[in-house]
Amino acid sequence: MSKRMHSHSIAWRKRVIDKAIIVLGALIALLELIRFLLQLLN
């Protein structure tokens, strides 16, 4: 495995992790919003 390929795979993994964090954050925000709306209805 060449050095360039290795650094590329690390950058790719970091990008995937960043995307996963964004998706998780969006899901949590959505759940908070739903909980807030349910409280308003009750």
From Swiss-Prot:
Protein name: Uncharacterized protein DinQ
Family membership: Belongs to the DinQ family.
Membrane-spanning parts: 21-41
Domain of life the protein comes from: Bacteria
UniProt keyword terms in alphabetical order: Membrane, Transmembrane, Transmembrane helix
Compartment(s) of residence: Membrane
GO cellular component term, pick one: membrane
Keyword Membrane on entry: yes
Source organism of the structure: Escherichia coli (strain UTI89 / UPEC)
Chief place where the protein resides: membrane
Membrane topology (UniProt): Single-pass membrane protein
